[in-house]
A protein has these predicted regions:
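Short hydrophobic/aromatic beta-strand element in the GNAT-like acyltransferase core
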Residues: 90, 130, 140, 144
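Extracytoplasmic/periplasmic sensor domains and loops in membrane signaling proteins
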Residues: 76-77, 105-138
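Juxtamembrane segments flanking the first transmembrane helix
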Residues: 6-99, 105-108, 125, 168, ...
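A short beta-strand signature within small-molecule sensing/ligand-binding domains used
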Residues: 136-148, 155
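Short glycine-/small-residue motifs
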Residues: 103, 156
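Selective recognition of signaling/oligomerization transmembrane alpha-helices
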Residues: 174-189
């Protein structure tokens, strides 16, 4: 019993086992890095791209409303009629109190109701706001900007985009990296 215990201790203390375990640890660390870093960088690039695109789309709407001294359903609808469709899932325009004056959603429209999405609240406080999240196979991006008339906030424009296309590309990248990692792990072991 003592002899088998000392053989096990000698086995774990041998230089070959230490090198082997070190090799496995290095390969595991490289595979972990390979599976996380490119995905994080890609996700960050998608977030930045979405912010740039959506902020630009909202700026076009804000610019079309900027000449109005106050916002109401009629003049907002007239101004929005000339704004080109920007590929957004939803656009809301509110007055300075958060009352929705315009909503592109056809069913369940929020026109005539108050909305307090955090991005709209920030816009009504004078800030541009953007948020983006990735879950359940889709990017959900939201942005809002204040509408100003003579340096006075008269409302806000909010845009929402639900995007599964870029999410599918990111999931495809993740799948390819996992397959590549499995192949490398199989070749190494």
């Amino acid at each position: 019993d003592k002899a088998s215990k000392s053989r096990r201790m000698a086995l774990w203390g041998s230089l070959q086992v230490k090198f082997g375990l070190s090799y496995i640890a290095v390969i595991a660390a490289v595979l972990l890095l390979l599976n996380t870093y490119p995905l994080l960088v890609s996700e960050d690039l998608v977030f930045r791209s979405k912010e740039t695109n959506m902020t630009g789309s909202v700026s076009v709407v804000v610019y079309s409303l900027a000449g109005l001294n106050r916002l109401n359903q009629e003049n907002v609808a007239a101004a929005m009629a000339v704004v080109e469709e920007t590929g957004l899932s939803r656009v809301l325009v509110t007055d300075s109190a958060g009352l929705v004056l315009y909503d592109t959603r056809e069913t369940g429209s929020a026109v005539g109701k108050y909305t307090f999405y955090s991005e709209i609240v920030q816009a009504l406080e004078g800030y541009d706001a953007f948020s983006c999240s990735y879950r359940d196979g889709a990017f959900r991006s939201r942005t809002a900007s204040p509408v100003l008339y003579q340096n006075r906030i008269i409302g806000a424009v909010y845009a929402y985009k639900y995007d599964t296309e870029q999410a599918a590309l990111l999931e495809g990248l993740q799948s390819n990296l996992l397959k590549l990692s499995a192949g490398i792990a199989a070749a190494v072991v």
